[in-house]
Amino acid sequence: MKKNIIAILFLFTSCVSTKTQNTYTTLETEIDYYTSDNTKELDFPFSDATIVNNVIYVAGQVGNLPGNTKVVPGGIKEETKQTMKNIERILVALGSSMDKVFKCTCMLLDISEWAEMSEEYKKFFAEDKRPSRSAFAGSGLALGAKIEIECWAIR
């Protein structure tokens, strides 16, 4: 009887170990890096976006014209509009679009400009397809910008 119980416990333990090993099997994940010619020319130390498992991670963008290190004039609304155009340009180059964005993070130099930024930002998304979003104030944004936005999208 003891031998039967030991045999059953051994069999049960063997099954659990096999299942655990299968659960932790990992596959190598490929990372694609996208850097536009404009970003290469400016010698920025980052990619415009990385793609992992069909998810596009767009690096923080500011309201500069492509190939230029100065943000557009006109304040938070104009900077936000140009920032969103920069994000859209990257997504389109990667075969995606703004309607596939599911998460954004907005960093503002001055949080009191949140409403003005949001007014321009929401123009880039269908009302029923606005991504989840976080926004906070930070100092020292890239290129002296008032706004920097990063996004995640499906390819």
Describe the role of every protein-language-model region:
Residues C15-K85, R89-L94, L109-R155:
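N-terminal presequence-like segments and the immediate start of the first folded domain
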Residues S97-M98:
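Alpha-helix N-cap/start motif
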Residues M1-T23:
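Bacterial Sec-dependent N-terminal signal peptides
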